[in-house]
């Protein structure tokens, strides 16, 4: 039970740090953006894409709940990936660069490598850029209609559960040695 608490604490701290960093960036950019003008409105339009190629503008408030849920799951996914790599790789520097390279390459590859476009909706790093997913931009770029908020939440949730199980297994194996 002690090990479970320790792993969950590490994951929650990683998620908290990620969410805090995101909030800090949003607060700073919102503050800087409001200098000389008003703060803005939740009715501000965002360009959305659909499979037919017809674009529409929708208010940002329509995306807020999905964006918050996907952002939290994305931060937890990033924390889980880093935690798994930190258990596998002993050195902090190699863990940092491996995590950075893995997450960047997978996120970039989801929209650039054409042969995987048909399965890109099953890759969790597709959903790390929540706003592009919610606006339909990634689905439009990859011509994959399965990329949406619901699929993203399910994929990120399943991957987080699997990575948490892997974390527990790796910690148990490490404890046995």
Where are the regions a protein language model picked out?
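Cytoplasmic juxtamembrane regions at transmembrane-helix boundaries
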Residues: 1, 79-103, 173-177
